[in-house]
Every structure is written in structure tokens, then in C-alpha cells.
Amino acid sequence: LIKAHSGEKAPLLPASAERPSWFNPLVDDLADRIQQRINQAAHVTPINLVALAILGTPKHAISRPDLLRFLELSQQLLRDLPYGPRVSMTEMAPAEMIDYALQMEWIQCKPHPLGDVLSAEGESGVLLSYFRNNISHLFAVAGWVACCFLNNRRLSVAGVVRMGQQLYPFLKSELFLPWDEEEFARRTEQVADWLVDREVLSKSSDGVFLSRPRE
């Protein structure tokens, strides 16, 4: 499954007219804009999503129900809160994605009395990192919100946003994200509300705090 997209054009004429002393900053800025446009024209394949899920687990292994749930949420997030109008995504259902990844031998299935375990071992795990990295920017905000609750059960919405804004310059430069700090803050709030709607997180009755479910 191969699909090519064309990104939005970045005009070169204004750049060529700049003073020579501005050349290096201009090239850096142009490179950032080109990379942002490449990111905004991403196509999400089944293997991208499977890699994102499995490589995010401690031992690169996940139960089939958990993987199905992750794939379903990931697809729905991209549909409900699109990264940009040029991003497209596989039409496969989550179960079809798993079957496809197994058929292509990107992952393995180990039978278990409590349910099948799907994993990526050896070279497959290394190669899958390429597919995960190609779509990391699409899930940067959701990943940040989720990260906040790895070691915290309850945080204020404002706290999640504030900490994210402090980290955002690094995320922006590493992943070539398109938003400014205020846009990132709004995006963070949107993603948090989306996770609440999907019962991944819960929000206090006054709307101030977010909580993850008790284990």
C-alpha cells in the first residue's frame, strides 16, 4: 500500500530577493516550512498505526483487544481533529490492519490462555520505528496529554496546557509542528476534551481537573 501526496508549495521568489546577510536564517526558515508542508501531506498506513501502538509498549507486545482499541481511537482522533486538510489515512478497519501486519510479517501473534499477544521482535521492531516516526507529529499533542498521566492520576487542565507550552519549543523544532504556542494550547484543550468524550480521561464537574481511570 503506497500512496504519494503533494505538499503545499513554498514560494522561492521572495527568498531569492533577500539580502545576502539574511541567507542562513532564510534557508533555515525555508527548510522548516518545507518540512512542515511535508508533514501536513502525510498518508497514514496500517503499518504506521500498528507500529505506533506496539512500539509504545514496554516490551513491544500488546493484547489483541488493546491493540484494536488503540487503532480505533487513533483513526477516530485523526478524523475528528484532523492535523491538516492534506493528511489522509488508510480505510482499513482495525481488525484488518492487524491481519495485514501479520500477513506482512511485521508483527507476530503468540497464543495465550488469556488472549493472543501481538508483538514485534528483533529486526521487525527496529524497522517499525521508521513507520512510527513518519507519523509521530500527527499524534504529538495526544501523546503529550497522555504522557502527563503516566505518573499522575489527576491534573488541572491549565497545568497540562502550561507544562505543554513550556515543552512546546522543543517539540516544535523536533517534529516541525505548525502551531504557535497559543494554537498549541487550544489544540491541547481540544485533544483533552476529545479524550474525555471517549472516556480515556474524565473531567471534574467544574471542568478544572482531568483524571485517568483508576486501575
Language-model-detected regions and their locations in the chain:
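Membrane-interfacial terminal anchoring regions of lipid-handling membrane enzymes
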Residues: 1-215
